Amino acid sequence: ANGGTPASFNLSLNRGTASDRLYSRFVVAVLTKDGYQEISKPHYITNPELVAPNQNPYKAPLSKKGLQMEISQIGDAFQLGVKHSSVNIAFHQILGSGIDYEYDGKVYHFSKPVIESYDATISAMSNKDITVTAIILNGWNPATPDLIVPGTTQKSNVFYYMPNVTTQAGFEQTRAIAAFLAERYDGSNPDYGKVSNWIIGNEINNQQWNHMGATSISNYVQTYQDAFRVFYTAIKSTSANDR
């Protein structure tokens, strides 16, 4: 059969406003006498890097020698010639007070001393040509239950939990955290530093490190995929060539 006539559409993303469409799904629909009828499956934006203010090239490691470290180990890293390193950034540690961040008309609060500690660590590394990878983790925090997938309970032998974007409140909070971190560590401020690589969750095939409780494999994978997409969109729409 012959294909239809090609068509293109333009619309504003309204980025940074309460009606932000950057994370929305879109469908093609036709107008019928009964209203609009969907004729395509929903699709998310797949190229958020096009709107990223930071279009700088990816910072590739200058060597394969790497180390996961803290600020107290910086001197050792320099002596060893380390050129890439990773840091853990956990939700339950970075939320608090002292830094207010507005996103889509809502204000979110981050711990000033904790964030400044990350600033010192990340900037010390990236300013010395060490490529930095951030590992994003979701620790249990009774003060922020919306960050945990509903139905998940705290376990003594579990270290971290699946990020929650399955509810509107969880989606909004997770999105704000992702956007804050992506903007904070985009390299524009040398006092904050530059994160070039992002790992969302840790050992996601291990229930102790990305716990969600009893569920099917397909539901677990879909939930992780949805959370990953939020971070991917936040990161790539800020720094186009981050990985």
Labelled PLM ranges:
Residues 8-12, 79, 234:
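Ser/Thr- (and often Asn-) enriched beta-sheet segments in non-cytosolic proteins
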Residues 14, 36-90:
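Boundary/entry segment of secreted carbohydrate-active catalytic domains
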Residues 20-22, 61, 126, 192:
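Solvent-exposed loop and beta-edge segments used for protein-protein assembly and interaction
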Residues 80-243:
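Substrate-binding cleft and catalytic face of glycoside hydrolase catalytic domains
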Residues 9, 67, 130:
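Extra-cytoplasmic beta-strand recognition segments
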Residues 1-53:
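Beta-strand-enriched, solvent-exposed domains that form extended recognition/catalytic surfaces
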Residues 3-7, 40-45, 58-64, 172-176, ...:
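Short linear motifs at secondary-structure transitions and domain/linker junctions
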